[in-house]
Amino acid sequence: MLKRLLGDSVSLVFGNLETVFKVCGSWFILQFALMMLIRLATGGADSQSADPGAMVLLSLVMLMFALASSASIGVAWHRFGLLGETPGLIHLRVGGVELKFILKSLLLALIFVCVWLLVGFVQVAIGVPVVTGVFAVLLLIFAIPTFLRLSLILPATAVEKPISLGEAYAISEGLGWRMFFASLILSLPFVLAGILFQYLLQGMAGSLPIILLQFKLMLLNVLLQIIVTVLGISVLTAGYRMAMEAHSSPDPSVFQ
């Protein structure tokens, strides 16, 4: 099952790189432009020296952008993987399906926050760090696979066949940890490569203008984010496809 998750996710992404950049390209170009504008506007000032009101407004703008872009990319990629639906060259769609996707994402985020609030409550109630640490580890052992199984509501929402949290959990038995390890295995090489490239570029800082160095670092981060993002989404796409195969005839797909 893990092997299939890995194989399906890799083939979906690296067998369709043109579609990857159609789905993500416009949003990441906007993100890159926004990052450059922020750097130019703030002049590299840190958050402590910046105007608090401006920082709050900036944070809200970034949050709204992140929600819109992640939903648009997630919906488009799930629909491509499960329905074979290919977006246009410029993909910036945020419609009804994307808004539902955002609401489901916020629901999952709320569940995640509640888990950490429970850990905080135990720390306050008991006040023994070792006990809290053990409790947190035990809770995570249960929470990680459960959270990923519940996350199958996202691809279901994207293809407009919504399911409840209970249904997502019921159809995904055995997939939780496998989706976690698949995501880890697929993303780790790119994360490490990003760290290595940043280290190498910083080592060249003396021979490059600072603005050029920042430009290269941001461009590198954007490219790596695209690959890591679609790989993570693809694991959920593949997991949903596998979970649904036993319950209905699979939709036409590009997992070939």
Labelled PLM ranges:
Residues A109-G127, S187-M204:
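Alpha-helical transmembrane segments and their membrane-interface junctions
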Residues T19-V23, M55-S59, L63, K100-F101, ...:
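Residue-level signature of transmembrane alpha-helical entry/exit and packing/kink sites
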Residues M1-A33, H91-C114, P145-A193, T237, ...:
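Interfacial aromatic "cap" segments that immediately flank transmembrane helices
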Residues C114-I141, L148-L152, V159:
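Membrane-proximal helix-loop-helix units in multi-pass membrane proteins
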Residues S47-V56, F65, S69-G88, R149-K161, ...:
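Juxtamembrane transition segments at transmembrane-helix termini in multipass membrane proteins
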Residues V61-F80, S105-F121:
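Specific transmembrane helices
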Residues S26-V61:
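Membrane-anchoring/interfacial helices and their immediately flanking loops
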Residues L63, L67, C114, V137-L140, ...:
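Hydrophobic alpha-helical membrane segments, chiefly transmembrane helices and signal peptide h-regions
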